[in-house]
Every structure is written in structure tokens, then in C-alpha cells.
């Protein structure tokens, strides 16, 4: 596996450490040890040492959201996101990207959002409003909870705050960190 020495050092430093185990939101949501920075780093170190194949850890690596909770709470200063991002690049370069990730990226590139959805017409009035104040709600709210967005705009208006809503809200920086997207 072709990752930097820095990434290898971080993976080796994290693989037997339990310090951030309770921090990972994915690990907490799934209740699975495999969804922690420690388990991911152990998998990476096994691939680096030739004890397992890259394809064996691909799904696990892509289950990391790159939220940075592990990094922000690391008392020793390591940044597991470094090896996760580099390994994601390796997975793509080796043609081992999980099918669900390829589908997600294709949907995003084709439609501009990960849902492949159109914006609800119930927000047309909010999009037409011009204001010095912009409201950024993100794509989850825009596509999955448009009525909540409409209610938030109405609430702000009642409070005397006129807001402009932009249709072109990105789903965040996470997708832009995908090597295949860059």
C-alpha cells in the first residue's frame, strides 16, 4: 500500500490505543468496535504489513465520516483522518472502491446532491427572497426536510429577520475530500 510514512506512523500509534474509542459517532451509533479509529488503524497496519488485503478494509475505511472527533479528542495529538484519507485514495487508485460509494459519487456528480433529488417547490418563495442575510441549511434539510426549512424561514421572518436561501447548498466538505471527486 502506497501511503506516506506520516500516515503509517499515525496508524501504528493509534492501533492499540483506546483513548478515543468512546468518541466516534459511527462507533457509538453502530455499537461495533470496527467503527473506531483504533480498529481502522489496526486494519491499515495489517495491510501495510501484508497480513491482509486492501479490499478487506475498504468498507470499514469508507464508514469513517472524517468528522474529526477522534482527532479533536486525542490527548497525544494524532490525526487518524490522515491515514483514512490516504487509504481512501489508495482504494480508489487500486479500483477497489465499494459499489455504494461509486453510486453515491455518480449521483452527486449527476444531480448536485447525494440524494439525486429535486428541490421541493414549497421553497420557491424562500429562494426568490433577496436579503443581506443568508440561511445555509445543508442538503439533508433542503432535500429531506423542506417543510422544516420553510418553517425556519417563516419563523425568522416573524422575528423580523429576512433571509435568502440558496438552492446550490453543498452537502459539506466531506464529499470534496473524496479523491475521485477532486
What are these regions (language model features)?
Residues 2-4, 8-11, 41-182:
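Iron-sulfur-cluster electron-transfer modules
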Residues 1-9, 19-22, 26:
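N-terminal structured subdomain of primase-like DNA metabolism proteins
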Amino acid at each position: 500500500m502506497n501511503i506516506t510514512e506520516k500516515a503509517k506512523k499515525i496508524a501504528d500509534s493509534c492501533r492499540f490505543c483506546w483513548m478515543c474509542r468512546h468518541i466516534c459517532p459511527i462507533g457509538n451509533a453502530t455499537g461495533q468496535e470496527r467503527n473506531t479509529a483504533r480498529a481502522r488503524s489496526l486494519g491499515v497496519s495489517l495491510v501495510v504489513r501484508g497480513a491482509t488485503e486492501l479490499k478487506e478494509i475498504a468498507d470499514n475505511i469508507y464508514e469513517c465520516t472524517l468528522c474529526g472527533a477522534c482527532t479533536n479528542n486525542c490527548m497525544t495529538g494524532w490525526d487518524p483522518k490522515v491515514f483514512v484519507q490516504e487509504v481512501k485514495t489508495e482504494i480508489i487508485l487500486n479500483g477497489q472502491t465499494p459499489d455504494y460509494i461509486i453510486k453515491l459519487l455518480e449521483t452527486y456528480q449527476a444531480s448536485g446532491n447525494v440524494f439525486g433529488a429535486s428541490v421541493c417547490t414549497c421553497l420557491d418563495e424562500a429562494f426568490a427572497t433577496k436579503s443581506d442575510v443568508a440561511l445555509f441549511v445543508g442538503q439533508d434539510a433542503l432535500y429531506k426536510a423542506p417543510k422544516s426549512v420553510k418553517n425556519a424561514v417563516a419563523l425568522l421572518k416573524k422575528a423580523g429577520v429576512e433571509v435568502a436561501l440558496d438552492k446550490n447548498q453543498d452537502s459539506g466538505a466531506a464529499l470534496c475530500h473524496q479523491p475521485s471527486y477532486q
